[in-house]
UniProtKB/Swiss-Prot annotation:
It comes from the Eukaryota. Belongs to the nudE family. The keyword Transmembrane does not apply. Residues 275-287, 372-383, 449-465, 473-485, 536-554 have a biased composition (Low complexity). The gene is NDE1. This is Nuclear distribution protein nudE homolog 1. It is found in: Cytoplasm, Cytoskeleton. GO terms for cellular component: cytoplasm; kinesin complex; kinetochore; microtubule.
Length: 666
């Protein structure tokens, strides 16, 4: 512009002044605008500066606040860091403590499990011991109940025994009084009848009248009493006239039931002063031959006949007649006793009681077969009395030959001595045995006298109980084996009196009547004359083997029973057809034979039998012992004993200390 202004040329100075004045005015306007803009700018910048200062102050304040906050947050951060570290330390310590506690709890748990296992094993052992104790307690209770039952049976049998002893003693007293009357009558007759003057004389009318009187009394007594027919034997009972009366008496092959004189009777007979005729009483009391008792050495006629001349005594027939009167009186007493027993059975009520076995009056009073021998001495033409109708009926029911039957069933024949048949009616056929099949079977008492451990009555042995020793097994087995051996060897039965037991049996309990060995039925028992050498210190040689066998077979008996021999109830009862069938089947089963075919009669007999009462009906039957002796106990015997099939196993006892030691070793 300056260049432009330099290039401008003015025409006049006024133009130039005017031009320069214009320019001045322009520059002044421009300055004024610039000053206005500057002031405006200064004012706006001042406002902006104020705003900037305010904003800066706010920023500074905010920055200070933020710095303050940062400081506070840093402090909080440090605090939380320390807290976190403390918490971490606490957590680690707590974790380690919990780990240690967990380890301790694990060890305690293991110990508790071991102790619990030991406790469980001990508990099982205690429970097993408790079961064994309970079973032992049941066993002891069954033994106790059985002992109570046996005690009750013993008391009943003792009461029956006392009653029978009182009745027997009364009969013995009556018999002794009758014997005293006989001795007095004999004494009076011996003094009243004069002795013939010469050694050889004929029979007087008094002798004939006495013989007739004795025959009349003898026939009346035989017809009045229902005697069984005589037992058939090898020897003839009727002797010819040429033989003496002692030689004419035959020794029967069966048992004799003549009662042995009690010690009181023997003492009484020794205290009575001996007269010439009273010696016959002592001989007739114990002698088996009552017919020979009339002609004893006290009679002067017999003393004269021993000198070589046979002479009949006039007092002999009268003595026999008086003797038969006494026997008829004894028969009346015996029948009165039987009537009383029957009345007692009727009073007992509706229960059927087995009929009591009473000793045979024929064998007690010396009638029967010996009566036939007695009558043969006076008259050989005297016939035997007619047998009773009941006896003949029972004899027809059995085998026709008694000898064959006695070989098949020894001691079971109809005429076995020791039994009497009380006639209650002609048509009645009730067996008198305790094993009657038609009656409801009562529980047999192990102490019953008919409960014999022999092959003729029962073929079963006592049951073997593993935990219960039977008090009757040992004695019955010993008595049965000895009785069987003696029966097979044909020896006499062992005596129950005056024999000392062997050392083996000295500690056994006293015998019950069921343990008494049954006497053999093939030979008659010893006479009372034989008892004297057996009681003496040195027995005779004839009975040495017998006493030796008896000492090993007989257990010791109480001293109270020594000398008391009760002849009542000796011998087996008569067998009926059902009983014979039962014995045949039992013998076949014991001998190993095959089973017998069941017939119609067997079914009828089985239907007739009532159910046997037994406490083993809902329990296991006890196993039976081997019947080596050929005898068994009837299965219907009341028994309340629980029988285990096998004994409980022993309890293993493992102490807990041993288990702990074994675990520690593992």
């Amino acid at each position: 512009m300056v260049d432009d202004e330099d290039d401008i040329t003015f025409d006049s100075p006024e133009e130039e002044i005017a031009h320069y004045r214009e320019k001045y005015r322009q520059a002044l306007d421009m300055l004024t605008d610039t000053r206005a803009e500057l002031e405006e700018f200064q004012q706006s910048s001042k406002e902006l500066e104020d705003e900037m200062e305010q904003e800066l102050a706010a920023n500074d304040k905010q920055q200070a606040d933020l710095r303050e906050k940062i400081k506070r947050l840093d402090a909080e951060k440090e605090e939380w860091r320390t807290k976190h570290i403390a918490l971490q330390k606490m957590h680690s310590s707590t974790t380690s403590a919990m780990q240690r506690e967990m380890d301790n709890l694990r060890s305690e748990r293991d110990k508790t499990l071991v102790a619990l296992r030991d406790l469980e094993m001990g508990n099982d052992e205690l429970e097993r011991n408790e079961r064994v104790a309970i079973s032992s307690l049941l066993d002891l209770e069954s033994k106790y109940n059985r002992a109570i039952e046996e005690k009750t049976l013993l008391e009943q049998d003792l009461a029956q025994k006392d009653e029978l002893e009182t009745e027997t003693q009364r009969l013995k007293d009556e018999l002794r009084e009758a014997n005293e009357e006989i001795s007095i009558l004999k004494d009076q007759l011996a003094r009243a009848i004069a002795t013939p003057p010469s050694s050889v004389s004929t029979s007087s009318p008094i002798h004939d009248a006495a013989c007739d009187l004795s025959r009349i009394h003898l026939s009346d007594d035989i017809n009045a009493s229902p005697l069984p027919p005589p037992v058939p034997s090898k020897n003839k009972s009727i002797t010819p006239e040429g033989h003496s009366p002692r030689r004419g008496l035959s020794r029967s092959g069966t048992m004799s039931s003549i009662p042995v004189a009690s010690p009181s009777t023997k003492r009484f007979s020794q205290q009575i002063p001996h007269s010439p005729s009273f010696s016959t009483l002592s001989r007739s009391t114990t002698s088996r031959n009552l017919a020979a008792a009339a002609g004893t050495p006290g009679s002067p006629a017999l003393a004269r006949s021993r000198s070589g001349i046979p002479q009949a005594s006039p007092a002999r027939g009268i003595v026999l007649a008086s003797h038969q009167q006494t026997k008829s009186r004894g028969f009346k007493l015996l029948h009165d006793l039987q009537a009383r027993l029957k009345a007692t059975d009727d009073k007992l009520g509706g229960a059927k009681v087995p009929r009591r076995n009473v000793s045979n009056p024929a064998s007690v009073f010396g009638v029967g077969k010996r009566v036939t021998s007695t009558t043969s001495t006076t008259s050989s033409t005297t016939t035997a009395p007619a047998p009773h109708a009941r006896v003949t009926a029972l004899a027809k029911d059995h085998n026709t030959t008694p000898t064959a039957q006695s070989q098949q069933f020894p001691g079971s024949g109809i005429m076995s001595p020791g039994w009497v048949l009380v006639g209650e009616g002609e048509g009645e056929d009730t067996p008198t045995g305790p094993w009657s099949m038609t009656l409801p079977a009562e529980p047999n008492s192990p102490l019953d006298p008919t409960f014999r451990s022999s092959s003729t009555t029962s073929n079963r042995s006592l049951p073997s109980r593993p935990g219960i020793p039977s008090p009757l097994a040992s004695g019955s087995a010993r008595s049965t084996t000895s009785g069987t051996a003696q029966r097979q060897a044909g020896q006499r039965p062992s005596s129950r009196l005056g024999l000392k037991a062997s050392r083996r049996d000295s500690e056994a309990r006293p015998l019950s009547p069921s343990m008494i060995p049954v006497p053999s039925f093939s030979s008659r028992p010893m006479s009372p004359d034989v008892y004297q050498p057996l009681r003496s210190a040195t027995p005779t040689s004839g009975f040495s083997s017998f006493s030796a066998s008896a000492s090993t077979s007989n257990p010791p008996r109480p001293n109270s029973r020594t000398g008391k021999r009760n002849p009542i109830g000796r011998g087996p009862p008569p067998l009926s057809s059902s009983t014979r069938l039962h014995h045949q089947r039992s013998r076949q089963s014991l001998s190993g034979a095959g089973p017998t075919p069941t017939t119609g009669a067997d079914k009828v007999e089985r239907a007739k039998r009532g159910p046997r009462r037994s406490s083993l009906s809902n329990m296991d039957k006890p196993s039976l012992m081997s019947a080596s002796s050929g005898s068994r106990t009837p299965s219907g015997r009341p028994t309340s004993v629980h029988v285990f099939r096998e004994t409980p196993p022993p309890v293993p006892r493992i102490p807990s200390a041993i288990l702990k030691e074994s675990k520690v070793k593992k």
